[in-house]
UniProtKB/Swiss-Prot annotation:
Keywords: Ribonucleoprotein, Ribosomal protein, RNA-binding, rRNA-binding
Keyword Heme: no
NCBIfam families named among the record's database cross-references: rplV_bact
Protein name from the UniProt record: Large ribosomal subunit protein uL22
Subunit structure: Part of the 50S ribosomal subunit.
InterPro entries associated with the record: Ribosomal_uL22, Ribosomal_uL22_bac/chlpt-type, Ribosomal_uL22_bac/org-type, Ribosomal_uL22_CS, Ribosomal_uL22_sf
GO biological process: translation
Function text: This protein binds specifically to 23S rRNA; its binding is stimulated by other ribosomal proteins, e.g. L4, L17, and L20. It is important during the early stages of 50S assembly. It makes multiple contacts with different domains of the 23S rRNA in the assembled 50S subunit and ribosome. The globular domain of the protein is located near the polypeptide exit tunnel on the outside of the subunit, while an extended beta-hairpin is found that lines the wall of the exit tunnel in the center of the 70S ribosome.
Gene Ontology molecular function, alphabetical: rRNA binding; structural constituent of ribosome
GO cellular component: cytosolic large ribosomal subunit
Superkingdom per UniProt: Bacteria
Amino acid sequence: MEVKAVYKYARISAKKMRDVAQEIQGLSVSQATDILSYTPKKGAYLLNKTLKSALANAENNAELSVDTLVVKSVMVDEGPTMRRTMPRARGSANMIRKRTSHITVILADQEG
């Protein structure tokens, strides 16, 4: 059985999140939590929050055992971009793009 958790509009670019997401794909939940808690990146903290949410969904909603769960997939998609202007010299302006992302974590039972 599969369980998922979604974190929408996370204030980090999808490109930065994908580097962290690739590290935990296919690992057990305990290994993934250990790796994320010792990774010194903002994306690791946000992904750990989403992983814990998926774990809580598995325990409470699906009534699955935590010990047998594996991270089946982690998808990081681009969310909407907030655009801001920054004044520059001679009356011009540059665009500042504040990117967001949607994080989806899917957990599944370990096979075998």
